[in-house]
Amino acid sequence: MTLQDLLDRILGRQPASATTARERLQLVLAHDRSDLSPELLDQMRREIFEVVAKYVDIDLEEGDVTLETEDRVTALVANLPIRRSMASSKPGS
């Protein structure tokens, strides 16, 4: 996510349709290059959420795991908003 994307999200601005189309195409290409089925990607998302949730309280509705491609390199990117760490929610800490 670029700084401009972050500002647009915070300010509630909608991306242009060309930008949305380009991002969708990049997602399709990333899926093709990674050779991951949608089912496997969904399973990975669930497991990543489960593991991270053991350590911090995350917002599952806002969280997302995606494949992103930049300069012919595909990356698995997790965007998981953290509400608080589990250590801060334990009594006596």
UniProtKB/Swiss-Prot annotation:
Keywords for this protein: Cell cycle, Cell division
Domain of life according to the entry: Bacteria
Pfam annotation, one family: MinE
Gene Ontology biological-process entries: cell division; regulation of division septum assembly
Alphabetized SUPFAM superfamilies for the sequence: Cell division protein MinE topological specificity domain (SSF55229)
Family: Belongs to the MinE family.
Function: Prevents the cell division inhibition by proteins MinC and MinD at internal division sites while permitting inhibition at polar sites. This ensures cell division at the proper site by restricting the formation of a division septum at the midpoint of the long axis of the cell.
Entry-linked HAMAP family: MinE
This protein's name: Cell division topological specificity factor
Native organism: Synechococcus sp. (strain WH7803)
